[in-house]
Amino acid sequence: MKKESMSRIERRKAQQRKKTPVQWKKSTTLFSSALIVSSVGTPVALLPVTAEATEEQPTNAEVAQAPTTETGLVETPTTETTPGTTEQPTTDSSTTTESTTESSKETPTTPSTEQPTADSTTPVESGTTDSSVAEITPVAPSATESEAAPAVTPDDEVKVPEARVASAQTFSALSPTQSPSEFIAELARCAQPIAQANDLYASVMMAQAIVESGWGASTLSKAPNYNLFGIKGSYNGQSVYMDTWEYLNGKWLVKKEPFRKYPSYMESFQDNAHVLKTTSFQAGVYYYAGAWKSNTSSYRDATAWLTGRYATDPSYNAKLNNVITAYNLTQYDTPSSGGNTGGGTVNPGTGGSNNQSGTNTYYTVKSGDTLNKIAAQYGVSVANLRSWNGISGDLIFVGQKLIVKKGASGNTGGSGSGGSNNNQSGTNTYYTVKSGDTLNKIAAQYGVSVANLRSWNGISGDLIFVGQKLIVKKGASGNTGGSNNGGSNNNQSGTNTYYTIKSGDTLNKIAAQYGVSVANLRSWNGISGDLIFAGQKIIVKKGTSGNTGGSSNGGSNNNQSGTNTYYTIKSGDTLNKISAQFGVSVANLQAWNNISGSLIFAGQKIIVKKGANSGSTNTNKPTNNGGGATTSYTIKSGDTLNKISAQFGVSVANLRSWNGIKGDLIFAGQTIIVKKGASAGGNASSTNSASGKRHTVKSGDSLWGLSMQYGISIQKIKQLNGLSGDTIYIGQTLKVG
């Protein structure tokens, strides 16, 4: 009778009181405004993140969905967008945690067996949940990690191939003891030196750590685990097992998997950098190369490259970009010292813009300044500004003091023969890499090119290590660059002609002055880009016995008269390495083999020397075409400078020089010079008939990737399509030629 007289509410409360702690520890989905959820750990649509309570929760706690914030870091999971979910995960699965003992009927958005009633709104306190891990396999060719993950549970019969990581997050309430600014400062301390040493963006790594770890609130990212990026496996034998979603046999299941356990955040950042720099599924081709600073124009190119590779979430780059923008993380993309250690340090005693004999001239950056604007103002190249001030990109700050002119005694470039750093005649000079060093920084410090540093030390990329000993100057018997002792501007029979670079010089300007191609200048002097220094001595004409250009008649590698010489690419090869090996320019290798970027493959056969009858570029006098006549060509739809240069056996640099082309933009119907006669001089005029080559954006595409694919610069793609930023959309049609 007493039971019948009880009201519905009383009966409900009585039922709730009967629940055991084990029942309350069933998997629940927790979203709150204090919880930032990264969709990196979810396949396309955000999946629920399960949490197990460590103590009995209030009987009427209500689980609320978190609204999407302006930064786009929180998304409400929906069952409609869960990819391939033919059967919703339930807590009676054989792969759930041991505490999940009863069946459940909830969908993936609420995988708990029963939600508490809404009579009370008591929130779940911080630290009361031991969160589960959300995990996703990157979109990549099948491969395993360099460090195999330990064996998991016995029921793990299906192995999901992982390219890099299974991005795992565990979530609890955001810690009230650490503010976002404090967390950012802690990340910056680790990210800055590691990113700088590995040619990565500190801003992108920090944003990844924030998004992946929920601002350090995940159990996986907290002590004693310190795993900010959810990398699976073990680290120095240490791992921690946590629950993660896996899509096996057509259904989403929760499995216990091992995740790496680090001594501190520093090791977590180092490990992630290692992943971004070394992951490869084909010899010589690095999966995340599109996120490296040297291959991008801004952090946005890097985040776009990671989308669809590091994470399947199509909005991954937007989430990272939002965090970077909202918290000004780009401020950490410059060296932590804030000054130049390459081309000469800032002298506090000299006034900005005060040019004194023997000293540097400085300029203090004002609002609205850019490197291009400052370079034009002082008549120097952007490359020089970067070199003198240790700047790797275009980021400068208001109030920053820059070197804008080098004094007579401040030359760090060229071929100085001083005895610094124990440089002895006939022997090499060595340098031991310190924390924060990069190849660009060391090259600027010792006045050599990055290409020479790579060649002298057998480095194929940009990865160097603290404590590594590098050759930074070659002894008298081993000089391979442009620092030979010859009379400057003194052309002698049988010897090279040298030129000492002055302030304001560029490779294009010098090439035009001496009637040679930019490609030849690069090849003769071991220059891989456009970076030159005031005071640097370079070869501008090769003597009769010193030709190392693209048409030298060496007999190596089965070179036969009148035929091309081929080389089969081996693992670890790069275009720079091959060009140095065969004494040709990278530009020629690209032109002869129709390569638009730097991507080559092990086993690929490429032309490394052009035969006498194959139209190879004469690197001594590239403008010498017998008969005194100029050959012209009318561009057809689909043509590119690389394609035309390969067709006519000339360099892209020559095509640009002969036709006044500054970038890669050409038009169908345009007539250009493809061979110069002895007396030819004028530039061909161009028409405005645009070609119709277009590309429809797919998942994972980026402006950098399209530029590599179609042999066109990022700036040209933006110009053709009226893009002001780097954001492109799936399904968008872009002009690419």
From Swiss-Prot:
Residue ranges annotated for the LysM domain, each copy included: 361-404, 429-472, 497-540, 565-608, 631-674, 693-736
Main localization of the protein described in the UniProt heading: secreted
Highest taxon in the source lineage: Bacteria
Catalytic activity, EC: 3.2.1.-
UniProt record, GO biological process: cell wall organization; defense response to bacterium; division septum assembly; killing of cells of another organism
Polar residues bias spans: 118-132
Compositional bias (Gly residues): 339-352, 410-419
Subcellular location: Secreted
Record's keyword terms, sorted: Antimicrobial, Bacteriolytic enzyme, Cell cycle, Cell division, Cell wall biogenesis/degradation, Glycosidase, Hydrolase, Repeat, Secreted, Septation, Signal
UniProt region (Disordered), positions on chain: 1-28, 51-132, 335-360, 409-429
Skewed-composition ranges (Basic and acidic residues): 1-13
InterPro entries per the UniProt record, alphabetical: LysM_dom, LysM_dom_sf, MGlyc_endo_b_GlcNAc-like_dom
Keyword Lipid biosynthesis included in the entry's annotation: no
TM region positions: none
GO molecular function annotation: amidase activity; hydrolase activity, acting on glycosyl bonds; lytic endotransglycosylase activity
A GO-annotated cellular component: extracellular region
Pfam (any one): LysM
Signal peptide: 1-53
Ranges of Low complexity composition bias in the record: 67-117, 420-429
Described purpose of this protein according to its UniProt entry: Hydrolyzes the cell wall of E.faecalis and M.lysodeikticus. May play an important role in cell wall growth and cell separation.
Family label: Belongs to the glycosyl hydrolase 73 family.
Domain notes: LysM domains are thought to be involved in peptidoglycan binding.
Protein name: Autolysin
Species in which this protein is naturally found: Enterococcus faecalis (strain ATCC 700802 / V583)
